[in-house]
Design a protein with these regions (language model features):
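Flexible juxtamembrane loops connecting transmembrane helices in multi-pass membrane enzymes
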Residues: 274-275, 290-325
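Hydrophobic transmembrane alpha-helices and their immediate junctions
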Residues: 79, 157, 226-229, 262-266, ...
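Loop-to-helix entry and N-terminal half of a specific, functionally important transmembrane alpha helix
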Residues: 16-29, 232-235, 364, 368, ...
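Transmembrane alpha-helices of multi-pass inner-membrane enzymes
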Residues: 19, 25, 29, 53-57, ...
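Alpha-helical transmembrane segments of multi-pass inner-membrane proteins
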Residues: 127-132, 136, 146-181, 190-194, ...
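N-terminal hydrophobic segments of proteins, predominantly signal-anchor/transmembrane helices
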Residues: 18-36, 52-128, 416-417
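Long extracytoplasmic/lumenal interhelical loops at the membrane interface
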Residues: 310-377
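A conserved mid-to-late transmembrane alpha helix and its immediate loop/hinge
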Residues: 204, 246, 357-396
Length: 469
């Protein structure tokens, strides 16, 4: 019976896998939309991710060469980051169990009974998805792999559409449902030209901008006609990104742009003179407009400039406070906590026991992947993940000039590192979809190189005409 089922399903394996991954990629941007997440008693993203996991596991189960595939895949550098997260997380769970006998706190017991199981469940789901994705990756065609990126762009496109709609609503009163987002400008004392920030369907700009920048990079890769990319995709995305007035988003674009420029400068295939000339021609009029209308530009950017006064004040800026003080709290209680952490999701314990200078409670995250993992998994776990993350970046960077897909892969990984500094979403669909698309780019680059080698070998083996040179 099982053998018959395998024979029946095997021809459809790639289609089923592609369907599951396309669903995950399309729905990933909505995981930061509260209305979407609260549609069911259990978070919607958890339900959809679990459904995707079940479908991928079913596809893998009917695979005929599971053991040999597993052995080969475990040697892949793609698993560095996964292993560096999975093993320390397991040790952190053991450490959290030990802490129950050491940290005599009802808040810690509450965390252990509630937040820990949820975090472990989410982590297991996403690590399992990416593991199965890598195991089954070679069964997907290039077209099916591209569908995953296009599906992710489709989800981001919905956020862009609602962002433009929100701009019309907040600027001219065009009717729109009240989404209860943090679109108001805050922490600014001076007058502003525009007193709102675009959030689209998300709760605040910092939730939105990582998806927009994802879309800019992936869209550039997938759009064959770059003029269509400019008018149909890039300009609408940049419009929403600009009016988000997100400091982290602006900094993210700048850093990724500088890194992409560095790749271009060190590239062996791009003519720098042809690139620099149009860039300078476009920057000169922009600079002149800024100089001529400086007061207007100053008011326009006041939602950003006006927040610099408290941006680096550790005691009054909640996000900075939650970034700095975990390095101190990590050494509380015992050396077990210092080395192995307080347990997955233990920032919830901090949220119940620590307070800001003005009396408010902490958030359940530092909004930084690396700081969260340092506190939750300790010096060993946090350090292992950081090292693996950097090693995989180096692995991609060394191959950047071999194929254009490798360039997109290293840019995406660099961008993921930047967004991880201000969005702690490593147990959410977006983080793992970007990991997936990065691996996808590397696989397409590998296939492209192999196709070129095969073409060269085929030409060298062609028989020459008698008397030919």
């Amino acid at each position: 019976m099982i053998t018959l089922l395998k024979k029946t399903i095997q021809p459809y394996q790639p289609k089923l896998m592609a369907l599951a991954l396309v669903l995950l990629a399309f729905l990933a941007p909505f995981a930061v939309v509260s209305q979407y997440q609260k549609a069911f008693p259990i978070a919607t993203s958890v339900i959809t991710s679990f459904a995707v996991l079940c479908l991928l596991f079913f596809v893998w189960f009917i695979e005929s060469e599971k053991t040999s595939q597993l052995v080969k895949s475990l040697k892949s550098p793609y698993y560095w980051t996964i292993i560096a997260l999975f093993i320390p997380a397991s040790l952190a769970i053991v450490a959290a169990t030990f802490n129950l006998t050491y940290i005599l706190s009802s808040e810690y017991v509450n965390y252990y009974q509630n937040s820990l199981p949820r975090r472990v469940l989410n982590g297991v789901i996403y690590i399992s998805i990416i593991t199965l994705f890598i195991l089954l990756l070679k069964r997907l065609t290039n077209t099916e792999l591209n569908y995953i990126g296009k599906a992710y762009l489709g989800g981001i496109g919905v956020l862009v559409l609602f962002g433009v709609w929100q701009f019309l609503h907040l600027s001219i009163g065009y009717p729109m449902p009240d989404l209860h987002t943090r679109s108001a400008v805050h922490s600014v004392q001076s007058e502003v030209l525009i007193n709102f920030r675009l959030t689209s369907l998300t709760e605040e700009p910092s939730f939105l901008v990582p998806f927009l920048i994802d879309g800019l990079i992936i869209g550039l890769m997938l759009y064959k006609n770059k003029r269509s990319y400019l008018w149909q995709w890039m300009l609408p995305v940049l419009f929403v990104l600009f009016f988000s007035f997100s400091i982290s988003g602006y900094a993210n674009v700048l850093l990724v742009g500088l890194f992409a420029l560095w790749l271009i400068i060190t590239s062996k295939t791009i003519n720098l003179k042809k690139l620099i000339k149009p860039v300078l021609v476009s920057l000169i009029p922009i600079g002149l407009v800024i100089w001529w209308k400086w007061s207007l530009v100053h008011e326009l950017f006041m939602p950003i400039i006006g927040r610099f006064d408290v941006l680096f004040d550790v005691t009054n800026h909640s996000r900075l406070y939650m970034l700095v003080y975990p390095f101190i709290w990590l050494f509380d209680y015992s050396w077990i906590n210092t080395l192995f952490g307080f347990g997955p999701g233990s920032y919830d314990f901090l949220a119940q026991t620590k307070f800001l200078a003005y009396g408010s409670k902490l958030s359940a995250t530092s909004n930084n992947v690396f700081v969260d993992l340092l506190f939750e998994h300790g010096l060993i776990g946090g350090g292992a993940f950081l090292i693996a993350f950097i090693l995989f970046f180096i692995h991609l960077y060394k191959r950047r000039n071999e194929d254009a897909y490798y360039q997109y892969a290293v840019i995406l990984w660099f961008h993921l590192g930047i967004t991880s500094l201000y969005r702690s979403d490593f147990v959410s669909p977006r983080f793992w979809v970007i990991v997936m698309i990065t691996v996808l780019c590397a696989e397409l680059g590998k296939r492209s190189l192999q196709a070129k080698r095969n073409s060269i070998e085929h030409e060298s083996l062609e028989p020459r005409k008698v008397g030919g040179k």
